[in-house]
Amino acid sequence: MTSLINADTRIKVSSVLNRDTTNYGKQNLIDGQVETCWNSEQGLPQNILLDFPSAVSVSSIVFQFQGGFVGKKCVVVGSTVDAPNDYSIAIDTFYPQDINPTQTFEFDATPALKRVKIIFEESTDFYGRITVYKLDVLGQ
């Protein structure tokens, strides 16, 4: 499995803490730096949307959360090239642990997808904030 995220992958997030995109923006999800992160505003649900330059088959998602600010219920959905705004392809639902180390969530390889949306329906934070230091999507 290889990383599907590259310079041409567009990423959108539902919110950024205090609109401070420099310190907490989406670019920090994939910059490889251990001290930078994406931090959402309070409120649920939150989401991360990945728009790939071409169709991909996803087989796992890698996260590193900040303990205490973990998306404790994550729903992953996808859309095809023919209908990029129709997120009707259910990929998986997983429940990350409230810990700091990297966690990998594997599932059956998906059909060819144009976009993948990760929805955080619940958070370990009372206010619904999510903090992610690392995100990777693996597959073909």
List each language-model region with its residue ranges:
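Disordered, acidic Ser/Thr/Pro-rich linker "stalks" and the adjacent N-terminal cap
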Residues: 1-53, 66
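Residue-level signal for short segments within beta-strands and strand-turn junctions
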Residues: 65, 78-80, 139
